[in-house]
């Protein structure tokens, strides 16, 4: 039996603020203290985004808290981190981001079954305010329908 997938952090606002076109999985190049801090669940991806720079995929503004037992060689919390994907995948993402005006944001950071740190990236398009209101109205309508069905079954 393998280990379970351990989700470190989740970007719940992303599904509210963006239309998600596609999702991808990428590895993260980390230092030792960053891995230890991630295992303790001390990360935040709320305002982070990914960008293709010089043919490499870089994750910006991801905050990993310094490791408590770390010494003076502890990592910088908000440093840019390299994401590990195949070159052809990076080129495809770069083309989509350039041509359609899409953005790459992380949805969640987790450790897979083999214990490797991974990030789930999403190719997204920003929602306008009226889109968000539409989603909220649809969710409320679904909730009302479910409530009415439950009431009908009780009688």
UniProtKB/Swiss-Prot annotation:
NCBIfam families: PRK05422.1 (NF003843), smpB (TIGR00086). The keyword DNA-binding does not apply. HAMAP family: SmpB (MF_00023). It is found in: Cytoplasm. CDD domains: SmpB. One of its GO terms (cellular component) is cytosol. Required for rescue of stalled ribosomes mediated by trans-translation. Binds to transfer-messenger RNA (tmRNA), required for stable association of tmRNA with ribosomes. tmRNA and SmpB together mimic tRNA shape, replacing the anticodon stem-loop with SmpB. tmRNA is encoded by the ssrA gene; the 2 termini fold to resemble tRNA(Ala) and it encodes a 'tag peptide', a short internal open reading frame. During trans-translation Ala-aminoacylated tmRNA acts like a tRNA, entering the A-site of stalled ribosomes, displacing the stalled mRNA. One of its GO terms (biological process) is trans-translation. One of its GO terms (molecular function) is RNA binding. Pfam families: SmpB. The keyword Cytoplasm applies. PANTHER family: SSRA-BINDING PROTEIN, TMRNA-BINDING COMPONENT OF TRANS-TRANSLATION TAGGING COMPLEX. InterPro entries: SmpB, SsrA-bd_prot, SsrA-bd_prot_CS. Belongs to the SmpB family. Keywords: Cytoplasm, RNA-binding. Its main location: cytoplasm. It comes from Moorella thermoacetica (strain ATCC 39073 / JCM 9320). It comes from the Bacteria. This is SsrA-binding protein. The lineage of its organism: Bacteria, Bacillati, Bacillota, Clostridia, Moorellales.
